[in-house]
Amino acid sequence: MDKSGSPNASRTSRRRRPRRGSRSASGADAGLRALTQQMLKLNRTLAIGRPTLNHPTFVGSESCKPGYTFTSITLKPPEIEKGSYFGRRLSLPDSVTDYDKKLVSRIQIRVNPLPKFDSTVWVTVRKVPSSSDLSVAAISAMFGDGNSPVLVYQYAASGVQANNKLLYDLSEMRADIGDMRKYAVLVYSKDDKLEKDEIALHVDVEHQRIPISRMLPT
């Protein structure tokens, strides 16, 4: 007896076969969802360390202390003869010094070599008495007393030295913005004459947030 006309056979013949590739497409969708979840998780993890309004980046990828931001100033040393010194007191903008009682936690100096840089310089930051005239003799003595960290920055074959930052921690001294005029950046040109267009010094002063600090520093 021919069973091809039976109801069961008819229903079987009418069943749609799975479309070619549907199973692989489903697997791809699952893989995409898994990848998306991984990316979201990674994004959340990275976001923890990103600078925000309250925690702007200060040292490399390190964030400022909670409740702190920083103000940057740039110094360009003049010509410094071989074996001689240069010093300049920190001068923050009036919009910052108006809040002179806000605490300062750290000072960072970043040496930016310009295209002509081919020298060796020593850089430090020191609290200098107001009576000091920042003479060569006075600066020389401050470099030699060992009371402050010193960054030695020198020309490299590549033109760039990896370590170009000096960090000075003031948190235990309870220094404030008003005290910053008592601090000076000091430079010693060791091996040869430093031309005025060889380096720029970027000084970052990390301090408690003030009312005007509503944007990330640039």
Curated annotation (Swiss-Prot):
Residues 12-22 have a biased composition (Basic residues). One of its GO terms (cellular component) is T=3 icosahedral viral capsid. Gene3D superfamilies: Cucumovirus coat protein, subunit A. Keywords: Acetylation, Capsid protein, Ribonucleoprotein, RNA-binding, T=3 icosahedral capsid protein, Viral nucleoprotein, Virion. The keyword Mitochondrion does not apply. It is found in: Virion. Pfam families: Cucumo_coat. Residues 1-32 are annotated as: Disordered. GO terms for molecular function: RNA binding; structural molecule activity. Residues 23-32 have a biased composition (Low complexity). The N-terminal arginine-rich stretch does not seem to be the major RNA-binding region that allows formation of an infectious ribonucleoprotein complex. Capsid protein. Probably binds RNA and plays a role in packaging. This is Capsid protein. It comes from Cucumber mosaic virus (strain WL) (CMV).
